[in-house]
């Protein structure tokens, strides 16, 4: 497969942080580029809530020699004490697109995970001439009831951060972190599958180590937007697309992800066995192989532990 790379990125081989000025502020964006000629279109990685540009170390090791990576830390959708300045999905989509302008990337593939999926979806829907391939994991038309309830709880906690239920001390933060992880992951599956349990533990440790209330941070980052039309009407056409989910995912179920895939013309839908919502962490090698095969346009039938179907 012949693809057009980015000369600008090739001139910045290795791993670099860039400042992306956007509107009245700016945000950091990590690029990881192998040395050599610009032969592959970059992959724009849109992380889920509470992830950063440094959350993809394993993925980088698996794929950075194959294609350039662009991993923005998009601005939080909500700023503490400044609810009136909340950003919308359209704003975040514009911010992500702006990074490609600043880095002089004309065409790119998109990987959207969890709450990064609504941004990736909108990019493909509105810019099919620029998005070469679309991959979404952990996608849902609307948040599951438990997650919606937890987001509402976070909004109430944010409204009065000095309330008795605010996670002010380390024990409170740990309790809030456990509550969040228990909703975002399948705790029953974690008891049977060590890789799922280990991924949940990594996220829990990261949340508990933060000085912020994990639930309020999740709401600010993008969580509250999940209550506001994450899946826009109109569908996606003209962009080769893949939607994937772990079979044990209870945050965005197999049915949820299939419903999103059904809005994308000709999408490939994959269910990865022995995986949960954090499948890119739990099954990092298999996840990277899947992404590389799809980006290269190679058959996915060689993948083990996956079921594959094609949407009409």
Residue ranges and their predicted role:
Residues 209-262, 271:
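Conserved serine/cysteine hydrolase catalytic core
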Residues 27-81:
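Conserved HGGG/HGGXW glycine-rich cap/lid loop of the alpha/beta-hydrolase fold
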Residues 269, 275-288:
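Catalytic histidine-centered segment of alpha/beta-hydrolase-like enzymes
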Residues 125, 132-168:
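Flexible "cap/lid" loop of the alpha/beta hydrolase fold
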Residues 119-123:
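Hydrolases whose catalytic domains are alpha/beta-hydrolase-1, hotdog thioesterase
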Residues 146, 167-235:
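Conserved alpha/beta-hydrolase catalytic His-Asp/Glu region
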Residues 1-43, 65-67, 292-312:
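Alpha/beta-hydrolase fold catalytic core
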Residues 70-111, 115, 289:
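Active-site loop/oxyanion-hole signature of alpha/beta-hydrolase fold enzymes
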């Amino acid at each position: 497969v012949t693809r057009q790379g980015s000369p600008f990125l090739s001139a910045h081989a290795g791993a670099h942080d860039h400042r992306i000025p956007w509107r009245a502020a700016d945000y950091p964006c990590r690029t990881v580029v192998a040395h050599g000629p610009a032969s592959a279109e970059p992959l724009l990685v849109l992380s889920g809530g509470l992830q950063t540009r440094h959350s993809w170390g394993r993925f980088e090791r698996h794929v950075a020699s194959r294609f350039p990576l662009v991993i923005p830390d998009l601005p939080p959708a909500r700023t503490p004490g400044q609810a009136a300045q909340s950003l919308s999905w359209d704003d975040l989509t514009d911010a992500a697109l702006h990074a490609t302008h600043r880095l002089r990337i004309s065409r790119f593939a998109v990987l959207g995970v969890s709450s990064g999926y609504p941004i990736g979806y909108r990019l493909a829907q509105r810019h099919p001439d620029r998005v070469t391939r679309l991959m979404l994991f952990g996608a849902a038309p609307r948040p599951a009831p438990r997650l919606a309830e937890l987001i509402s709880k976070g909004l109430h906690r944010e409204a009065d951060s000095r309330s008795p239920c605010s996670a002010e001390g380390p024990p409170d933060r740990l309790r809030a972190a456990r509550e969040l992880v228990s909703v975002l992951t399948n705790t029953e599956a974690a008891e049977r599958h060590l890789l799922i349990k280990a991924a949940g533990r990594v996220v829990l440790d990261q949340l508990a180590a933060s000085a912020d209330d994990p639930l309020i941070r999740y709401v600010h980052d993008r969580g509250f937007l999940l209550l506001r039309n994450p899946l826009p009407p109109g569908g996606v056409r003209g962009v080769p697309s893949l939607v994937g989910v772990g079979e044990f995912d209870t945050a965005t179920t197999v049915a949820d992800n299939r419903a999103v895939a059904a809005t994308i013309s000709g999408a490939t839908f994959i269910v990865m066995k022995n995986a949960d919502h954090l499948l890119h962490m739990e099954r990092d090698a298999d996840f990277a192989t899947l992404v590389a095969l799809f980006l290269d346009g190679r058959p996915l039938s060689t993948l083990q532990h996956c079921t594959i179907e094609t949407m009409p």
